């Protein structure tokens, strides 16, 4: 609670005064710390040339620059390691920051190709040929048509381009 002092100013209780001094000292030490003074400016990755949707990114197409705009919103790529090998979803213009939402992982399976379906249930393993009904990256849940029977099943794309079928 606040109390009015005889001078007319609002004053906090006597116990809060030392707490205010400790808070001020902590804020001053954070602002004046050598770590804050030595912190590197933020960086961003920008394209050197126009990159069109579907192109695979590599380090030769990109460069890292210091961010000079303090109002730049978060969500942009900060290092080339984050994007090396990814594929663009939309056109990237030279000199503009690359948003993480404009990139995707490279597809492990493509629509219409032939893949191996694997179904595991306990000790039983069944494999069959399948055809994905959509493009998908590793870890995506997609629908696949069994080439032999025509039955459509759902499964998860694995790193070796097989699809592990989900039990119904």
Curated annotation (Swiss-Prot):
GO terms for cellular component: periplasmic space. Pfam families: ChapFlgA. Its main location: periplasm. GO terms for biological process: bacterial-type flagellum assembly. PANTHER family: FLAGELLA BASAL BODY P-RING FORMATION PROTEIN FLGA. Belongs to the FlgA family. This is Flagellar protein FlgA. It comes from Rhizobium meliloti (strain 1021). The lineage of its organism: Bacteria, Pseudomonadati, Pseudomonadota, Alphaproteobacteria, Hyphomicrobiales. The gene is flgA.
């Amino acid at each position: 609670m606040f109390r009015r002092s005889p001078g007319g100013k609002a004053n906090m209780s006597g116990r809060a005064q030392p707490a205010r001094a400790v808070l001020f000292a902590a804020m001053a030490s954070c602002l004046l710390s050598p770590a804050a003074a030595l912190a590197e400016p933020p960086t961003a990755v920008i394209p050197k040339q126009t990159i069109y949707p579907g192109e695979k990114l590599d380090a030769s197409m990109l460069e890292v620059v210091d961010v000079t705009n303090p109002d730049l919103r978060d969500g942009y790529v900060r290092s080339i390691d984050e994007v090396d090998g990814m594929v663009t979803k939309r056109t990237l213009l030279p000199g503009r920051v690359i948003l993480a939402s404009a990139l995707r992982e490279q597809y492990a399976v493509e629509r219409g190709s032939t893949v191996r379906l694997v179904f595991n249930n306990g000790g039983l393993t069944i494999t069959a040929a399948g055809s994905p009904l959509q493009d998908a990256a590793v870890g995506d849940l997609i629908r696949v048509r069994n080439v032999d029977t025509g039955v459509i099943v759902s499964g998860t794309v694995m790193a070796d381009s097989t699809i592990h079928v989900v039990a119904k």
